[in-house]
Amino acid sequence: MVVVTHISTSFHQISPSFFHLRLRNPSTTSSSRPKLDGGFALSIRAYIEKPNSFSTFANKVIGSLPVIGLLARIISDEGGVGRDLVDFAEFRKRVGNKCTPDDSRAFYEFQQRRGKAGEPLYVLLCCWVAAVGAGLLKSEEILEGVTRVSISNDLEFEEQNFIALMTEARQRRAKLNIDAPTIPMELRVEKALEGIYACCFRRGLIEEEDEKLLKVMLIAVFPSVEKSEIERIIKEKATRVEEGGEEENVMAKRLPKEAIQMQMKDLEFLQQQNIES
């Protein structure tokens, strides 16, 4: 299998190592990223396991034990037990470890069809924030973030921004003693598809070949969801877009490019203020 070191590759196959790449933007540094205070805890089910499975319960128990939980985090291949957050890098690693050559080829071919906006990292960011943030983030927050990243190409910034928003939402719920709602896996897939459409299609039609590639990619990321259900979700989305039923929703949820750029400047200013204080 070919080891890919850059997104724009001439090979028709993407190895798992592609998904493990750390994100670095030459125009930014780690010092400009928002620093998160301790105390953040989030239950992550996503594509990793079913919400009520025995392994979920066991991981929560193990994670609550100080010494055993620490050892489990060190030796676990997948990393993260109990209520730990699966960050974007870990998410990509897990997806890459489970991807088949056909799965990797689908990511590559999708990029070839959609151009830069269809880069695998963009697709995976949409899947990650849907898997992790559903129930904590508003749909508008997800769509605004994935739309920004298609313009700025700063995935690390958006990851940290999403985490900050989830942290804030989690803390608000903790103060009110309210648990985050349990979001079915099928709805997480729908959220992921909404993000991919906003980021990669820019209100264009979802063609038949796109549907096939989306099905392969979403099954690779969300294997616990029935293939027929994922196919239904994609088909219904494509039909709504073709019939114009999504136009009003897209116009209401997506911000103009200028507004997004202003929003990014505001976020960067607030980050700098936090660092200086």
Swiss-Prot record:
Its main location: plastid. Residues 1-45 form a transit peptide. InterPro entries: PSA3. It is a peripheral membrane protein. The keyword Membrane applies. Disruption phenotype: Seedling lethality when homozygous. Pale green and slow growing phenotype when grown on MS medium supplemented with 2% sucrose. It is found in: Plastid, Chloroplast; Plastid, Chloroplast thylakoid membrane. GO terms for cellular component: chloroplast; chloroplast envelope; chloroplast stroma; chloroplast thylakoid membrane; cytosol; mitochondrion; nucleus; stromal side of plastid thylakoid membrane. One of its GO terms (biological process) is photosystem I assembly. Keywords: Chloroplast, Membrane, Plastid, Thylakoid, Transit peptide. It comes from the Eukaryota. Nuclear genome-encoded factor required for the accumulation of photosystem I (PSI). Functions as a PSI biogenesis factor. Cooperates with PYG7 to promote the stable assembly of PSI in the thylakoid membrane. May target primarily the PsaC subunit. Does not seem to be required for the expression of chloroplast genes encoding PSI subunits. PANTHER family: PHOTOSYSTEM I ASSEMBLY FACTOR PSA3, CHLOROPLASTIC. Interacts with PYG7. This is Photosystem I assembly factor PSA3, chloroplastic.
